[in-house]
Amino acid sequence: EEATLVVTAGTTMYGLTELGGLVSGESVVVIGPGPIGLLGVAIAKSLGASPVSLIGTRNDRLEIGKKLGADYVFNVKEEKNIVEAVKKKVSNLGVDYVIECAGTEQALNDAILMTNRGGKICLAAFPHKAVKINIPHMVINNIYMYGIRGEGKSATHRAMTFMKEKKTILK
């Protein structure tokens, strides 16, 4: 059970640190409260991201996200405009990082629109077919989008050490 958590945490850690260069104090939004998304909340918070927000459709998963460190949770079904709701709570300019774990066209475009100029979007999930995304907005705002497929040995080792030190992730 813990080994599965380490591999999943390693994926998120790799996306935030190795590829994303997360700096303490930067804002992170996680879209999709599945295993990668929930551990993304815990890892981002433990790395010093602030605030950390979680977006999803299931209140039970959003509650778990709060316990793992989410400062704000948003239920897409309860928000008229999720991008505006996030910007209102976090920053009118947008967020520094989005970890996209839902894999839907809507989630991808919401991620693009809520990301601050110069911000980063980490794709941890992907749609099962081609989708249209707002490339002009990304280019105009210098938004960097990258994907993660796996965690890599070094990130898994770092995640294991990190999780031993930050035992709250495992509780």
Each model region followed by its residue ranges:
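Helix-to-beta-strand junctions that scaffold the AdoMet/dcAdoMet cofactor pocket
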Residues: 115-117
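Generic hydrophobic/aromatic pocket-lining and core-packing "Φ" positions
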Residues: 41, 62, 108-112, 135
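Glycine-centered, small-residue-biased loops immediately flanking beta-strands
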Residues: 26, 119-120
